[in-house]
Amino acid sequence: MKIAILSRDGTLYSCKRLREAAIQRGHLVEILDPLSCYMNINPAASSIHYKGRKLPHFDAVIPRIGTAITFYGTAALRQFEMLGSYPLNESVAIARARDKLRSMQLLARQGIDLPVTGIVHSPDDTSDLIDMVGGAPLVVKLVEGTQGIGVVLAETRQAAESVIDAFRGLNAHILVQEYIKEAQGCDIRCLVVGDEVVAAIERRAKEGDFRSNLHRGGAASVASITPQEREIAIKAARTMALDVAGVDILRANRGPLVMEVNASPGLEGIEKTTGIDIAGKMIRWIERYATTEYCLKTGG
């Protein structure tokens, strides 16, 4: 097969591993910067051009689209979909997962347990907002934040009011969430491919922090997950219609709680921690579906 990887930086670990895994299985691979793709949207002869040339047909596309370029990145991916390329995560699913509010609404609708969460743009009554989510301590986040950026733990009511008021001055959407103290700065990242959790790690925050993101200096170890956690991770990925997803789970006293569903999970931390060839599993998923179900679905 001919496979395109959409990424702004082909030197990143995940891109290199996906390229390597695809080549090892006999496929042709090209890494394309989605921002350098430009599209001819024409009912008679749609096409995609890249750095002065018309791109050939690709059997499959692997989107590694960063949050900052979601709008144009998913537009480029849609064009590949229009031309019959199988996407490892469809554009609509990526856009849905990037909308944190919509994601949580969809997960809640499916009965998937979440931390108690409030979202607001410009709260007129900060005190009522804090009461609504159960009071301090609580976590205040910018909806548009990623990798732990724009996330603050407010341990007292006064601190929570100050943080919310400060964020309100940024004219941003604010997410206010209960703090799961018993998780002790740890979460579980489940890597879902299709209908299987192929790997899981526990991420622990560095000392003095509560954010377990590896990009923020957190540490990782292999996690043994329960059948309930496995089921919830798969259900969360299905709810978001993602073939590949990183599902982040907190272990609370009342049971596992889904924190986030990531449409473009990094492979470095989880592959190096577990030793599992996740990139290879993603390529095998493409082999299974790019040549059968998707062609039937799109008429390709």
From Swiss-Prot:
<keyword id="KW-0436">Ligase</keyword>
<dbReference type="InterPro" id="IPR023533">
    <property type="entry name" value="RimK"/>
</dbReference>
<dbReference type="InterPro" id="IPR013651">
    <property type="entry name" value="ATP-grasp_RimK-type"/>
</dbReference>
<dbReference type="Pfam" id="PF08443">
    <property type="entry name" value="RimK"/>
</dbReference>
<dbReference type="InterPro" id="IPR011761">
    <property type="entry name" value="ATP-grasp"/>
</dbReference>
<feature type="binding site">
    <location>
        <position position="248"/>
    </location>
    <ligand>
        <name>Mn(2+) 1</name>
    </ligand>
</feature>
<dbReference type="GO" id="GO:0018169">
    <property type="term" value="F:ribosomal S6-glutamic acid ligase activity"/>
</dbReference>
<keyword id="KW-0464">Manganese</keyword>
<keyword id="KW-0479">Metal-binding</keyword>
<keyword id="KW-0547">Nucleotide-binding</keyword>
<comment type="function">
    <text>An L-glutamate ligase that catalyzes the ATP-dependent post-translational addition of glutamate residues to the C-terminus of ribosomal protein bS6 (RpsF). Is also able to catalyze the synthesis of poly-alpha-glutamate in vitro, via ATP hydrolysis from unprotected glutamate as substrate. The number of glutamate residues added to either RpsF or to poly-alpha-glutamate changes with pH.</text>
</comment>
<dbReference type="GO" id="GO:0046872">
    <property type="term" value="F:metal ion binding"/>
</dbReference>
<dbReference type="InterPro" id="IPR041107">
    <property type="entry name" value="Rimk_N"/>
</dbReference>
<feature type="binding site">
    <location>
        <position position="248"/>
    </location>
    <ligand>
        <name>Mg(2+) 1</name>
    </ligand>
</feature>
<feature type="binding site">
    <location>
        <position position="260"/>
    </location>
    <ligand>
        <name>Mg(2+) 1</name>
    </ligand>
</feature>
<dbReference type="Pfam" id="PF18030">
    <property type="entry name" value="Rimk_N"/>
</dbReference>
<comment type="similarity">
    <text>Belongs to the RimK family.</text>
</comment>
<feature type="binding site">
    <location>
        <position position="262"/>
    </location>
    <ligand>
        <name>Mg(2+) 2</name>
    </ligand>
</feature>
<dbReference type="GO" id="GO:0009432">
    <property type="term" value="P:SOS response"/>
</dbReference>
<feature type="domain" description="ATP-grasp">
    <location>
        <begin position="104"/>
        <end position="287"/>
    </location>
</feature>
<feature type="binding site">
    <location>
        <begin position="211"/>
        <end position="213"/>
    </location>
    <ligand>
        <name>ATP</name>
    </ligand>
</feature>
<feature type="binding site">
    <location>
        <position position="187"/>
    </location>
    <ligand>
        <name>ATP</name>
    </ligand>
</feature>
<feature type="binding site">
    <location>
        <position position="260"/>
    </location>
    <ligand>
        <name>Mn(2+) 1</name>
    </ligand>
</feature>
<keyword id="KW-0067">ATP-binding</keyword>
<dbReference type="GO" id="GO:0005737">
    <property type="term" value="C:cytoplasm"/>
</dbReference>
<dbReference type="GO" id="GO:0005524">
    <property type="term" value="F:ATP binding"/>
</dbReference>
<feature type="binding site">
    <location>
        <position position="262"/>
    </location>
    <ligand>
        <name>Mn(2+) 2</name>
    </ligand>
</feature>
<dbReference type="InterPro" id="IPR004666">
    <property type="entry name" value="Rp_bS6_RimK/Lys_biosynth_LsyX"/>
</dbReference>
<feature type="binding site">
    <location>
        <position position="260"/>
    </location>
    <ligand>
        <name>Mg(2+) 2</name>
    </ligand>
</feature>
<dbReference type="GO" id="GO:0036211">
    <property type="term" value="P:protein modification process"/>
</dbReference>
<feature type="binding site">
    <location>
        <position position="141"/>
    </location>
    <ligand>
        <name>ATP</name>
    </ligand>
</feature>
<feature type="binding site">
    <location>
        <begin position="178"/>
        <end position="179"/>
    </location>
    <ligand>
        <name>ATP</name>
    </ligand>
</feature>
<feature type="binding site">
    <location>
        <position position="260"/>
    </location>
    <ligand>
        <name>Mn(2+) 2</name>
    </ligand>
</feature>
<protein>
    <recommendedName>
        <fullName>Ribosomal protein bS6--L-glutamate ligase</fullName>
        <ecNumber>6.3.2.-</ecNumber>
    </recommendedName>
</protein>
<dbReference type="GO" id="GO:0006412">
    <property type="term" value="P:translation"/>
</dbReference>
<keyword id="KW-0460">Magnesium</keyword>
<keyword id="KW-0648">Protein biosynthesis</keyword>
<dbReference type="InterPro" id="IPR013815">
    <property type="entry name" value="ATP_grasp_subdomain_1"/>
</dbReference>
